[in-house]
Every structure is written in C-alpha cells, then in structure tokens.
C-alpha cells in the first residue's frame, strides 16, 4: 500500500489549485499524506481538531508558505473558499456516531467546487466496528454517493485482515 510521487500524479491526473485535507491527530499517517499532496497544489489547507497535532505536523513540513494550518473540527470547519480536491483519509471513523459522520460528510461536500474531486479512504466497516468505531468506508461511501459521482474505487488488502481498506474517488457534478 505504498505510493510514490508519480502514483499521486497519475491518480489525480493534474495539479489542483486549492486542496483541503482534514486530519485526525490519532492517525499517524498525516505528515506523509500532506507531504505527498503539497507539491501538487497551489494552496493546501490542513485542519485538525488538536492544536498540538497541527503544530507537530507543521514543524515536520518545514513551514511551507502555501500550506494553511487550521485548528478546527471537520464538522464545523467553514470557509467561503471552494476546494478543487478534498482528501479525507482515516478521519471520519473517529467521530462518535453515524449522525456526526453524516454532518461531516455534508460539510465537506458543501466546500467542494463544481467538478471538484474528493478522495476518501478508510478501513472497511468490519474492521472499524471490530476496533470499536461506529462505521468505516462502506458507510461513508454510501453517504458520498448520495450527492457525488463515484469515479473509481480501489480495494487495498493489507498483510492482515485488520489492514483492509477502500479508497474511492468522487467528483461533484457541474450542475
């Protein structure tokens, strides 16, 4: 499940002017994903609910001037800016219930530009429930399919069943 810089470019097909990447400080992969995204966007906005996590990741990223760091909850973050790409990975299953996940999904979709893309990745529902979370990727994908068009999906099988996850790319309609 490794990716290289060329994999990122091939996946997205182009550079994105404005990118949003909500994070959750309990997930350890955040600096890696931001490091992979940063070269492909003119403006990267990173949000996390924990100030210390933002500070730590910001320090690792060497204060890149085109990255905007914001302490905020993914359910309440608000901006007039629309994003060309929103990357949500290993974030939503930390929320307390399906209603909170739905609120976050609705909020994120509202910030997606017309024809914008959303890449969503998470552990599968069965793994998330085994870990004590309310939902995983299949639940969120169903929510995203209510308002976005699913363009592609990739099932990632890990070394153990606990590592299985789904990645999906969605696009917002222009109408």
Swiss-Prot record:
GO terms for molecular function: S-adenosylmethionine-dependent methyltransferase activity. InterPro entries: NodS (IPR020944), SAM-dependent_MTases_sf (IPR029063), SAM-MeTfrase_NodS-like (IPR008715). Its EC number is 2.1.1.-. GO terms for biological process: methylation; oligosaccharide biosynthetic process. Keywords: Methyltransferase, Nodulation, Transferase. It comes from the Bacteria. Belongs to the NodS family. SAM-utilizing methyltransferase involved in nod factor synthesis. This is Nodulation protein S. It comes from Rhizobium fredii (Sinorhizobium fredii). The lineage of its organism: Bacteria, Pseudomonadati, Pseudomonadota, Alphaproteobacteria, Hyphomicrobiales. The gene is nodS.
């Amino acid at each position: 499940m490794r990716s290289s810089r060329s994999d990122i470019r091939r996946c997205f097909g182009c550079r994105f002017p404005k990118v949003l990447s909500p994070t959750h400080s309990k997930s350890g992969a955040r600096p890696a994903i931001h490091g992979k995204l940063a070269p492909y966007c003119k403006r990267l906005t990173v949000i996390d609910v924990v100030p210390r996590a933002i500070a730590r990741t910001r320090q690792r990223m060497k204060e890149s001037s085109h990255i905007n760091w914001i302490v905020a909850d993914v359910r309440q973050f608000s901006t007039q800016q629309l994003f060309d790409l929103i990357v949500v990975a290993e974030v939503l299953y930390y929320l307390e219930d399906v209603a909170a996940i739905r609120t976050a999904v609705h909020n994120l979709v509202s910030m997606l530009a017309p024809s914008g893309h959303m890449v969503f990745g998470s552990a599968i529902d069965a793994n998330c429930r085994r870990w004590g979370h309310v939902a995983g990727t299949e639940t969120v994908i169903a929510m995203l399919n209510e308002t976005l068009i699913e363009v592609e999906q990739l099932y990632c099988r890990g070394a153990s069943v606990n590592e299985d996850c789904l990645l999906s790319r969605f696009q917002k309609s222009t109408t």
